[in-house]
Amino acid sequence: MTSLFRRSSSGSGGGGTAGARGGGGGTAAPQELNNSRPARQVRRLEFNQAMDDFKTMFPNMDYDIIECVLRANSGAVDATIDQLLQMNLEGGGSSGGVYEDSSDSEDSIPPEILERTLEPDSSDEEPPPVYSPPAYHMHVFDRPYPLAPPTPPPRIDALGSGAPTSQRRYRNWNPPLLGNLPDDFLRILPQQLDSIQGNAGGPKPGSGEGCPPAMAGPGPGDQESRWKQYLEDERIALFLQNEEFMKELQRNRDFLLALERDRLKYESQKSKSSSVAVGNDFGFSSPVPGTGDANPAVSEDALFRDKLKHMGKSTRRKLFELARAFSEKTKMRKSKRKHLLKHQSLGAAASTANLLDDVEGHACDEDFRGRRQEAPKVEEGLREGQ
């Protein structure tokens, strides 16, 4: 069945009959295969997929013949299809029994295909040629141009060990995680929130000593009263930092009596709430003289400041009055001091001016006297010269 793979020299029109006639002659030169066509785009498929498709298209052909033709054409789909069609047409006139008998013989394979398949590095030693994967399961041969094979991504292991190591370290770098943050981290406390909402239009007040809690009423009157209270508390806090004002408060008998009443009220309320606190209060008040012996000034000042924390409304009013009186006194003292300094500076300037006048006057008198004494001497000299 060598005529299945050879083309007679009589032309393309009688190719089938000429091939059948020349089957007995073994000296006919093999003609060119059907894959010598004008240059066109070569389509390649995956090997197993192409073999399955060709077996479906040519069920009468043997699997080994299809594989040999495909390998001879280096996986070119169009050339393989043309050659298989030509072989199928040429083998159509012959009987199936002869075809089956001669399919296993080496004479049924063209010598070109046989040479390529029987080379030392055959399919047993090397894998089949690489074919591009099929784009479609159906209609594989309908596409005019094949898709380009996808380029595999570059392997990281194959790169150099210089820069990639740093990149790998950078990729594997995990930032250190912080521990659990406190509950009040970046949070506004409720009292701060109330003060911000109440005083949104003005400057933000700080939490001064004795500052009352912010009222919930949104009215302008309440806001004004809060502002006044805040300013008064700030002034009182500043006054309490003045040692002279503190000494004046300790010398004021009425204020000390009111402060003592407030302290007793606070202690009675505290004793009602808990009986243990009463013993602590009495124990705290009894050793005051003992501590006063060690450092009486510090202990008295600390005790007085502790009493100021429990002031009532009446005592607070007295404190405001005393603070106003103290501020007026200090203003008067400052104005008197400025006045005295001004007078002293003016008196010093006048005295220096008088001293300068006296010095200049004495100098002028001496010059005038010296000139009067020199005048008659000059006249006598002139007369003698004449």
Swiss-Prot record:
SMART domains: CUE. GO terms for molecular function: ubiquitin binding. It holds the Pfam family CUE. Residues 1-10 have a biased composition (Low complexity). Residues 1-40, 147-172, 195-225, 367-386 are annotated as: Disordered. Residues 11-27, 199-209 have a biased composition (Gly residues). Residues 46-89 form the CUE domain. This is CUE domain-containing protein 1. It comes from Homo sapiens. The gene is CUEDC1.
